[in-house]
């Protein structure tokens, strides 16, 4: 069965795993998912991830979630731009998440990046999700 929103599917898997206090969660692999996970890792929301190839030829990504003293680092994870309603923002209209305590992840012409990186590089794009 095909997934109409692969990023939304991955974020839901992470949200469900955090709710169940799991240490790891797996999701089908793609380049866009890996770029989003790169941003989450560099911003300190996950410990890391590994890509693995299975016998049937389908690659999977195993995400290692991060906890601080038993409390999940990810408190809120929401998808903004969806297949039915894409949300694009200019550099001037990139929203702050929780007064700067959280981040937004954008897909820009210069790659997938966090909101503060997009402001530094003066580039807008599709607002993928918000993390707090």
UniProtKB/Swiss-Prot annotation:
Concerning Gene3D superfamilies, the annotation shows: 3.30.1370.30, 3.30.1490.10
> Might you report a single GO cellular component term?
ribosome
Question: Which GO biological-process labels does this protein carry?
Answer: translation
Q: Does the keyword NAD apply?
A: no
Molecular function as annotated in GO: rRNA binding; structural constituent of ribosome
Instruction: Kindly indicate whether the keyword Ribonucleoprotein belongs to this entry.
Output: yes
User: Which keywords does the record carry?
Assistant: Ribonucleoprotein, Ribosomal protein, RNA-binding, rRNA-binding
Q: How does it assemble?
A: Part of the 30S ribosomal subunit. Contacts proteins S5 and S12.
| Family to which this protein belongs | Belongs to the universal ribosomal protein uS8 family.
Q: What does this protein do?
A: One of the primary rRNA binding proteins, it binds directly to 16S rRNA central domain where it helps coordinate assembly of the platform of the 30S subunit.
Protein name (Swiss-Prot/TrEMBL): Small ribosomal subunit protein uS8
User: Which species does the entry assign this protein to?
Assistant: Brucella anthropi (strain ATCC 49188 / DSM 6882 / CCUG 24695 / JCM 21032 / LMG 3331 / NBRC 15819 / NCTC 12168 / Alc 37)
Organism lineage reads as:
Bacteria, Pseudomonadati, Pseudomonadota, Alphaproteobacteria, Hyphomicrobiales
Gene name of this polypeptide: rpsH
């Amino acid at each position: 069965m095909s997934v109409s929103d692969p990023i939304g599917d991955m974020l839901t898997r992470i949200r469900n795993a955090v709710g169940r206090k799991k240490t790891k969660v797996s999701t089908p692999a793609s380049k866009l998912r890996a770029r989003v996970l790169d941003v989450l890792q560099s911003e300190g929301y996950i410990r890391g991830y590994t890509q693995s190839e299975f016998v049937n030829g389908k690659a999977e990504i195993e995400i290692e979630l991060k906890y601080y003293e038993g409390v999940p680092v990810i408190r809120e994870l929401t998808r903004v731009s969806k297949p039915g309603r894409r949300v694009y923002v200019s550099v001037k209209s990139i929203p702050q998440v929780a007064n700067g305590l959280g981040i937004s992840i954008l897909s820009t012409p210069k790659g997938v990046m966090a909101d503060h990186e997009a402001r530094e590089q003066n580039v807008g794009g599709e607002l993928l999700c918000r993390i707090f």
